[in-house]
Every structure is written in C-alpha cells, then in structure tokens.
Amino acid sequence: MISFLLCLALLIIGYFVYGKIVDNTFGPDDRETPAVRINDGVDYVVMPQWKLFLVQLLNIAGLGPIFGALQGALWGPVVFLWITFGTIFAGGVHDYFSGMMSERNDGASIAEVTGRYLGPVMQNIMRVFSVVLLIMVGTVFAVGPAGLIVTLCKNGGMSGVMTTTLFWLIIILVYYFIATFISIDAIIGKIYPVFGICLIIMAVGVIFGIFTNPAYTIPEIWNNFTNMHPQGTPIWSFMFITVACGAISGFHATQSPLMARCMKSEKQGHFVFYGAMVSEGIIALIWAAAGCALYTITDGKMVGLAEALAAGQSAACLLYTSDA
C-alpha cells in the first residue's frame, strides 16, 4: 500500500513541478486563441476550464486506463512504476505539446500540424495512420462498452434485444455520429463532463473500497520486484504496450485538438492537457492496484487475476472488481 501511495504522490508532485517546467518551456502567452478569434459556434466555442478538463479527460481516457491497467497488473506492482514515470515524463509531455501545437495552429488536427512542419508526404502518412488508428480505437471503444452494458443487463434480469451486443453497438454508433456532426457544446460539452465526473468517482470508490476492507492488500513493489505474469510474458516490452493509455498513448494527439479549439487562454493548457493526462495516470494506478489487491497471488504469480481475465475478459473483470 505504501508503494501505491508513493506513486500517487509522485504523480501529483509531477503535475505541479515537471508539468510546470513543460508549460514554461512551451511559453504560453496572452495571444488570442482559436476559440476567441474564430468562434464559429460549431467546433470553435469557448468553454469553461473545468469543462475543458473533464471533456479532455474522457476523450483520452474512457476504458483505456481501466482495461489496460487491469491487464498490466498481471505483471504485478512493477506496473506502478511504468504508470507513474510514463505519465509524468512521457504521456503528460506528449499530451501537452500535441494540444498546444494544435492550439497554435488554429486547432488543426495532428495530421495537419505534422504537414505544416514536416511537409506533405509526412502529412499524408499521418492522415492514413490516424484513420487506421481511429478505426481501431473506435472499434474497441464501441465493442467494449456494448459488451459491458450487455453484461449489466443480463445480470439485472433483462432479456431480449436489450441483451444483444448488436443493439447497443447501433445505439453507440448513432450517438457517435450525432455528437460528431453538431456543435461541440450541444452534446459533448454537456454530457462528457458528467461522464468524466463519473469516471473519477468510480476510481475513488474503488480505492476507497480497497483501503477500508482489511481483506484486500496492495502488494509492495520492493517485495515483488519481479515478473509476476502467470505465463512468464516479458515485462519489456509487453507490459509497456499493454498499459499504453495509462502512461502514454499517441491516440491522445487525435483528441487534443477538440479542446484546443475551445480554450479561452493558452495558460489553461497546463491544467487541461497535462492535468488530464496525470488524472488518467492516477485512474490507471488505482485500477492496477485493484487488479493486484483483489485477486489471489499463487507462488508469486498473479494467477487469480489471470483467471478472471480469461473467464470474462476485461469487461467482466471490471464487473468483478466493482462488485468486490
């Protein structure tokens, strides 16, 4: 438990110390932002800072720091180190600069920003890469929630169309299109902050449950500084790519322009971009701790967690963890 608290403290300190160094390196000033200068009422709309933060958090997080962190916990508490230092020195820096570079270029997408600095060839490569990446991520972010809702409906005694994955996939995709084609403050600006708060409350509830239940103990890094994966899968590089979203993810660069177009001041960037990534790191740290604490460790291996993941994959494991 001490390991967890130390990593949590490092993430918070990292936001105020290293995050400020990153912010000062970029040098935000008082120039007009795209939201103020363009302000078309559709994509460029000034939003309050707290909304910017919560929307950015939900855009970059979602199920990523939950599913990925639970999978990463198979390697044991060493995953805490990757989440902590990856977030501070990699993920936070990446998200801040991708967001602020977009803001400095009229809220341009990552492909357009790449083209302005590296030329048309790299711009087209990044366009193709972004489309492929977004299709892959969009698929996961549709199928994952759909499967989770189906499991909840079945556990709640429902039947019929409400327990079919296809039905919920259609609902989610319809929502995707509606939210994409209308003004950003019509749905995203109103609903996303609520979901963002729910994501935070859920994480707080999980760690509160672990701290208040004597049956659960978060293993210490120094007592388990080894590969605890039941199948012996190497830490390098498998753990690092498994917990990508909870430490650093290039996908975030495709999301940051949304909030870069809604900032009133460049000085909000530290809180909105770096702060959202640190918050995601904290959420990932909590879920990784839950994966390490709630399941049986046999002969120094995370056997219980592996069995839970194999039985129901990440969505089912999320339910088991929440119930516990």
Descriptions of predicted regions:
Residues I2-G19, G72-S102:
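Extracellular loop-to-transmembrane helix junctions
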Residues L10-I66, C262:
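Membrane-interface "cap" regions at the ends of multi-pass membrane proteins
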Residues G138-A142, A146-N155, F167, T180, ...:
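Hydrophobic alpha-helical segments and their helix-loop junctions in multi-pass secondary transporters
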Residues Y320-A324:
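Conserved small/polar residues in nucleotide/adenosyl-binding loops
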Residues Y15, A90-D106, I110-F181, A244-I248:
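Helix-loop-helix module between adjacent transmembrane segments
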Residues C7-V17, S130, L134-G138, G196-P214, ...:
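Selective recognition of specific alpha-helical transmembrane segments in multi-pass small-molecule
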